[in-house]
Amino acid sequence: MERVLIVNADDFGLSKGQNYGIVEAYRNGVVTSTTALVNGEAIDHAAQLSRELPALGVGMHFVLTLGKPVSEMPGLTRDGLLGKWIWQMAEEDTLPLDEIAHELACQYQRFIDVFGSEPTHLDSHHHVHMFPQIFPIVARFAAQRGIALRIDRQTVLNADDLPSDLRSTQGFSSEFYGEEITEACFLRILDASAHRGEASLEVMCHPAFVDNIIRQSAYCYPRLTELEVLTSASLKAAIAERGYRPGSFLDI
């Protein structure tokens, strides 16, 4: 059985080093798709690079934890900035859901303005779209626009009122992340997906060259390791041997 493999590089637009790393992993590696933070410092640079790579699928990386929002969000921001306190607010069930829904629409329009087209799919920075309170908002938004959505199905099992026409891959993995990133790790993800009988799989990654912005990230130098693994000729061959076809969210 032929299986579709989407290797999606998150954080397009975060910095020039991140952008160049993603492009390198696409041109000379196994990355097939990316998602962009429209409030990133290098988002215009990302859009410029993407115009040279029309086959690279570019989706939107919905942001509620970093930088400035596109719209006014007094209920979620502190001193005008987004941050990781969103986890505490989610636990306390005090999320400003109307603000979040409006911000999603504004970021989506910002994406269209910057890239000149709709995104191939949606996901989010730090997976905040998988919060039980937020997921129905994002799922309905994606379904209404006919675009795909990253779904961690272990989490979605607890969500109610999901659109029946929501598109996603059958499998998703965030395991290619951390301090122990190897080619063997990547291939274990593929083998586990094949064992489950999944016809499509998304693997999340964050390849980058380190610059001053990336150096400020808690997840810094492993991005270089990811880039090295993802551009390995042996990895590309091993993926093909397993019957996977590289694709984007336009293929599901």
Curated annotation (Swiss-Prot):
Cofactor(s) needed for function: Mg(2+)
- In Gene Ontology terms, what is a biological process of this protein? polysaccharide catabolic process
Top-rank taxon: Bacteria
| GO molecular-function terms, A-Z | chitin disaccharide deacetylase activity; deacetylase activity; metal ion binding
Q: Where does Mg(2+) bind?
A: H61, H125
**Predominant location category:** cytoplasm
* E.C. numbers: 3.5.1.105
Q: Name one Pfam family in it.
A: YdjC
Reaction catalysed by this chain? N,N'-diacetylchitobiose + H2O = N-acetyl-beta-D-glucosaminyl-(1->4)-D-glucosamine + acetate; diacetylchitobiose-6'-phosphate + H2O = N'-monoacetylchitobiose-6'-phosphate + acetate
InterPro entries in UniProt: COD_ChbG_bac, Glyco_hydro/deAcase_b/a-brl, YdjC-like
Question: What pathway, per the record?
Answer: Glycan degradation; chitin degradation
Q: Where in the cell is it found?
A: Cytoplasm
Task: Give the keywords, sorted.
Answer: Carbohydrate metabolism, Chitin degradation, Cytoplasm, Hydrolase, Magnesium, Metal-binding, Polysaccharide degradation
Which CDD domains did the record assign? Answer: YdjC_EF3048_like
Q: What is any one of the record's Gene Ontology cellular component terms? A: cytoplasm
Question: What family name appears in the similarity comment?
Answer: Belongs to the YdjC deacetylase family. ChbG subfamily.
Per its database record, what is this protein's job?
Answer: Involved in the degradation of chitin. ChbG is essential for growth on the acetylated chitooligosaccharides chitobiose and chitotriose but is dispensable for growth on cellobiose and chitosan dimer, the deacetylated form of chitobiose. Deacetylation of chitobiose-6-P and chitotriose-6-P is necessary for both the activation of the chb promoter by the regulatory protein ChbR and the hydrolysis of phosphorylated beta-glucosides by the phospho-beta-glucosidase ChbF.
Tell me which NCBIfam families the record gives.
PRK02134.1
Indicate what this protein is called per its UniProt record. Answer: Chitooligosaccharide deacetylase
Native source organism of the sequence: Salmonella typhimurium (strain LT2 / SGSC1412 / ATCC 700720)
